[in-house]
């Protein structure tokens, strides 16, 4: 049985369709004082999968998730698997300053305490967050789904570019699937007050060096896990355009996209902005339903 929270109802419906499983309806609403009402409509199976992202508004979506998990256990579910495509607070995985809350740890404890028996997510920003759980966890990569989308849209070998070294493993993963070249951008200090972002020379799969000259005339795809304000992406788009890329498309798993990020990315020269549906956005063109269904089948 699949149950979708209000943040992930469409995704839950597609997962249920992939698995040919029952989809249980959840009624949610707010009382006049702002408190949340939740009711599960239907008989509950022994094993239930809840799908609910906890992006903006994070606190509301998290509370709904906790209500769902606890309610399902009260209603007789023996096992509750929790799929959180995007986990809010996951970037607050450590104490940066004295007195700060380690919010990711608190959220993990809340999910477990509510009664979750298993936790599944996608491309969590800091993998150490999974260590906060004492229940089985799975961190699915969405790069296969993104690679499939890219492959269907173009008829030539693209160049996959990570906007920084941290995102390079994502670019490598997609490039391996598509059998194409990849590289990343890096900031090079030229003097006390001068920093320049450049393409990093890397050895390609054909033993040829991927460098600045490799960009000219290519369809470039920038790959990252999360785009929030988009500053790094805007910079990457501009650089690739300057280097002569035929087109620049931007892809990510989690489209947070705050402070006008989408508009600024397009203004920089991006051909398109593509993301998964871990969060609901205009860019959400890559479905995670098959990836979730494959894990649930195991």
UniProtKB/Swiss-Prot annotation:
GO terms for cellular component: cytoplasm; ribose phosphate diphosphokinase complex. The keyword Cell cycle does not apply. Mg(2+) 1 binds at residue 125. It catalyses: D-ribose 5-phosphate + ATP = 5-phospho-alpha-D-ribose 1-diphosphate + AMP + H(+). CDD domains: PRTases_typeI. Its cofactor is Mg(2+). The active site is at residue 187. GO terms for biological process: 5-phosphoribose 1-diphosphate biosynthetic process; purine nucleotide biosynthetic process. ATP binds at residues 33-35, 91-92. Binds 2 Mg(2+) ions per subunit. Keywords: ATP-binding, Cytoplasm, Kinase, Magnesium, Metal-binding, Nucleotide biosynthesis, Nucleotide-binding, Transferase. GO terms for molecular function: ATP binding; kinase activity; magnesium ion binding; ribose phosphate diphosphokinase activity. Pathway: Metabolic intermediate biosynthesis; 5-phospho-alpha-D-ribose 1-diphosphate biosynthesis; 5-phospho-alpha-D-ribose 1-diphosphate from D-ribose 5-phosphate (route I): step 1/1. Mg(2+) 2 binds at residue 164. Its EC number is 2.7.6.1. It comes from the Archaea. InterPro entries: Pribosyltran_N, PRibTrfase_dom, PRTase-like, Rib-P_diPkinase, Rib-P_diPkinase_arc. It is found in: Cytoplasm. D-ribose 5-phosphate binds at residues 189, 224. Belongs to the ribose-phosphate pyrophosphokinase family. Class III (archaeal) subfamily. PANTHER family: RIBOSE-PHOSPHATE DIPHOSPHOKINASE FAMILY MEMBER (PTHR10210), RIBOSE-PHOSPHATE PYROPHOSPHOKINASE 2 (PTHR10210:SF32). Involved in the biosynthesis of the central metabolite phospho-alpha-D-ribosyl-1-pyrophosphate (PRPP) via the transfer of pyrophosphoryl group from ATP to 1-hydroxyl of ribose-5-phosphate (Rib-5-P). This is Ribose-phosphate pyrophosphokinase. The gene is prs.
């Amino acid at each position: 049985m699949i149950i979708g929270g209000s943040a992930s109802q469409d995704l839950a419906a597609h997962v249920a369709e992939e698995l040919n499983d029952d989809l249980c309806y959840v009624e949610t609403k707010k009382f006049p004082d702002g408190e949340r009402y939740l009711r599960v409509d239907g008989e509950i199976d022994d094993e239930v999968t809840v799908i609910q992202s906890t992006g903006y508004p994070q606190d509301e979506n998290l509370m709904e998730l906790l209500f769902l998990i606890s309610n399902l256990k009260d209603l007789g579910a023996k096992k509750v698997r929790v799929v959180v495509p995007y986990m809010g607070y996951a970037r607050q995985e450590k104490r940066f300053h004295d007195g700060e809350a380690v919010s990711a740890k608190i959220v993990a404890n809340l999910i477990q305490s509510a009664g979750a028996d298993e936790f599944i997510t996608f491309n969590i920003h800091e993998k150490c967050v999974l260590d906060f759980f004492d229940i089985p966890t799975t961190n699915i990569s969405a790069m296969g789904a993104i690679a499939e989308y890219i492959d269907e849209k173009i008829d030539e070998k693209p160049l996959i570019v990570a906007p920084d070294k941290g995102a390079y493993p994502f670019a490598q993963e997609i490039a391996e699937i598509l059998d194409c070249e990849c590289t990343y951008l890096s900031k090079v200090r030229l003097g006390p007050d001068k920093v320049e972002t450049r393409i990093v020379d890397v050895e390609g799969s054909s033993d040829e060096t991927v460098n600045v000259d490799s960009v000219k005339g290519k369809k470039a795809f920038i790959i990252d896990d999360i785009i929030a304000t988009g500053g790094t992406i805007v910079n990457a788009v501009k650089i690739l355009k300057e280097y002569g890329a035929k087109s620049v498309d931007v892809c990510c798993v989690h489209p947070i996209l705050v402070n006008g990020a989408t508009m600024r990315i397009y203004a920089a020269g991006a051909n398109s902005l593509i993301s998964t549906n871990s969060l609901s956005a205009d860019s959400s063109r890559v479905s995670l339903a098959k990836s979730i269904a494959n894990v649930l089948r195991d």
